[in-house]
């Protein structure tokens, strides 16, 4: 037997309906805020992610599915969506008429990680990006939309945490202060943090190692080093969040695993998923578009993990009910049931039937399995008079209806 690859999961009927609900809710909510969908390729040039995410990040160093194709091109299965969206934005000059764009995407991402609850090698994200605006009202609106989305799913437990990572003007001084702080505590850091404490010191604040958490507990905070512009931006973002009625808390230790973030960063976190506490995360990336060869256009966005959202939805039932199950007794009745089913489906009615000519008792059990709203029973007598018994499965009420798609549809819709 050939089995699937570790960390690459099938989404089966019964579960896929939960995913469809997650995706449909995103489309509905995002459209309220003026977002349009963009579809991006799974395979990109490796250089895209090296330039955007950063050479010293865990993703680039350890986790990317990269290979050289038959044309000797270095390519990578996308580990995240923002870089691909920005590459498309630049390549197709979406900024030519208006630099402001509101885009969302959904689909699989790939990282070579140790599979565990809520973390897989093929995982799925829904993300949204806004380009062309630095106004903190946009930061607040993006965060408000994210919280609105989770509220629409009925998930109020994840809480919003925000921080500011400053800008190229104020971050270098903070970065040096953090390097000096870490240098005095190198013996307490994990090997990864020791190796890159000079090239990517902020990652030590986000390290999952208990030793690193303890060693950095008293580390300087970026919020204390913000320049006047970044401080004003963060203050205004918080003010607009409060005006929007969006609840948040400040987490001054929050950093992101991608190098392109500036100023506002955020996470939606929960205590219900163990170590995988973040279900959505993002931030502002005002230099990314120019770093990728485009104009100096700012941006902000987020991504959320579909698998983690599905876990939070728990045992909620999302499988739809067919409108009608047709139980047919005998070959002629089967033929009539098939004709009727096709006509009903063309009229927008969801219909199932039995194809094997089993007993009425067996077919009624099958109707129960499908959880159909109604069952139509057709036998020889029904064929003779051109009418059949329609049973409402929730109430048990039975009525006789003519055997035409229009008459049956009128009784059940």
UniProtKB/Swiss-Prot annotation:
InterPro entries: aa-tRNA-synth_II, aa-tRNA-synth_II/BPL/LPL, Anticodon-bd, Anticodon-bd_dom_sf, His-tRNA-ligase, HisRS-like_core, HisRS/HisZ, HisRS_anticodon. Homodimer. One of its GO terms (biological process) is histidyl-tRNA aminoacylation. Coiled coil: none annotated. Its EC number is 6.1.1.21. The lineage of its organism: Bacteria, Pseudomonadati, Thermodesulfobacteriota, Desulfuromonadia, Geobacterales. It is an enzyme of class 6 (ligase). It comes from the Bacteria. It is found in: Cytoplasm. GO terms for molecular function: ATP binding; histidine-tRNA ligase activity. SUPFAM superfamilies: Class II aaRS ABD-related (SSF52954), Class II aaRS and biotin synthetases (SSF55681). Belongs to the class-II aminoacyl-tRNA synthetase family. It holds the Pfam family tRNA-synt_His. It catalyses: tRNA(His) + L-histidine + ATP = L-histidyl-tRNA(His) + AMP + diphosphate + H(+). PANTHER family: HISTIDINE--TRNA LIGASE, MITOCHONDRIAL-RELATED, HISTIDYL-TRNA SYNTHETASE. The keyword Ligase applies. Its main location: cytoplasm. Keywords: Aminoacyl-tRNA synthetase, ATP-binding, Cytoplasm, Ligase, Nucleotide-binding, Protein biosynthesis. This is Histidine--tRNA ligase. One of its GO terms (cellular component) is cytoplasm. The keyword Cytoplasm applies.
